[in-house]
């Protein structure tokens, strides 16, 4: 049997590293961390005690190929504090959001996409 410890990181394909770094670093406010000197461009960010790795594949597109927000599509989830505060922050930066404050789960959800169409769910323990 495999004995899993924890999720270590999530890797996402991006097409424009500067644009992705602006979104993840400036808009979402994730702290960028040191990255080994790989032979391809990318960036690493801290997500609490986990990591997000952005990887550039020149000349290709990301998996989805669209920026439409679809909660049923592949996505990763980040738990945040303050539903309204998070929503206000995203909207003040012009980020399109799909709100699900009340749903079948026990946590309020906000879905967004990054500039390449990767879906991100931000959820909170409870509605403010």
Annotate each PLM feature.
Residues 13-52:
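Core segments of cupin and vicinal oxygen chelate
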Residues 48-52, 59-61, 83-85:
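Short, charged/polar surface micro-motifs in flexible loops or helix N-caps
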Residues 1-18, 73-78, 126-128:
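N-terminal beta-strand motif that seeds the catalytic metal site of vicinal oxygen chelate
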Residues 69, 75-88, 92:
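Mid-chain, well-packed structural core segment of small domains
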Residues 40, 60-65, 97-99:
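A short, acidic/glycine-rich surface segment
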Residues 39-41, 72, 106:
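Exposed loop/turn and edge beta-strand positions of beta-sandwich/beta-sheet ligand-binding modules
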Residues 1-3, 87-128:
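Vicinal oxygen chelate
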């Amino acid at each position: 049997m495999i004995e899993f410890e924890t999720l270590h990181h999530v890797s996402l394909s991006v097409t424009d590293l500067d644009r992705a770094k602006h979104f993840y670093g400036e808009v979402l406010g994730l702290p960028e961390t040191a990255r080994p000197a790989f032979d391809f461009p990318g960036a690493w960010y801290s997500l609490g005690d986990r990591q997000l790795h952005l990887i550039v594949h020149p000349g290709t597109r990301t998996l989805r190929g669209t920026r439409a927000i679809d909660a049923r599509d592949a996505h990763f989830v980040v738990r945040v504090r303050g539903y309204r505060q998070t929503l206000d922050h995203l909207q003040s930066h012009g980020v399109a959001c799909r709100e699900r404050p009340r749903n079948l789960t026990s946590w309020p959800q906000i879905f967004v996409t990054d500039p390449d169409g990767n879906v991100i769910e931000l959820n909170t323990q409870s509605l403010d």
